[in-house]
Amino acid sequence: GVYKFSMAISPLDCMGCGVCTHVCPVGALTMQPLESQEDQQPVFDYMVAKVAEKKELQDFTVKGSQFRQPMLEFSGSCAGCAETSYARLVTQLFGDRMYISNATGCSSIWGGPGATSPYCTDKNGHGPAWCNSLFEDNAEHGFGMYVGQEKIREDLMSKTEQLIAIEWTQPALKEAAQKWLNTKDDGNANAEATKEYVAALQANIATVDELAAVPKFAEHAAELKAKGEKFCDCDACKLVAEILDKKDYLSKKSVWIFGGDGWAYDIGYGGLDHILASGRNVKVLVMDTE
């Protein structure tokens, strides 16, 4: 094959629960004293620093998901905790465009301990956006996150349509804008379309200095510069600037509500029932440990 496969384990981060040795169907792992495994730490560090994801191996199958970067790591949860296994898998599938509203409970303790976060980012700085409100209003809190970003995105769609309609908008920008609109409801396709759209927006906004280089616009450029403006104020450039200001909301988000059975089945049930009945595209992960 093209690639070789290896699993590197971080000895310094092992919780010592032994679950991996029990569930491995071929008995490939055994528990060993920490001091006998310390020479394996540089191997793990090398893998993290040097080995990149292989996009051609990734898909939404069980096997394919495991070739994707986990965006939940070293949480400090209890040894053998199953909650982090499920949460980690969700981040492998949707983490680079994920919003999480987390009910107070175990998952908010390992998920948001003071001064640190187990949720991480990829090489592009993209990763789960996590927030914890209270115990009883988690569903409403997550719903608010969804509706808020949806409203901003609807505004960006309107501005994009206006930008396409302007006669002097560059053809390449119009093409990227239309591709973004066409894929707006497809999370995977829209991720790539968003990258292309942002690049086209950044390449097609005229700065005041560029405007000043055109003789017929030189006087107007000087007026803009005196006001402290950085960009051309034509209708197209104003729309481009407004869209770029909210570029983090362009990609389709995957909004999740995390919580335990005490929240979902008891104190927060009324809110959860209301949110699910709304029909909005909000996902819920209930960690039932009762």
Predicted regions mapped to residue ranges:
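Iron-sulfur cluster-binding cysteine motifs and their immediate structural context
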Residues: 1-2, 6-10, 15, 19-37, ...
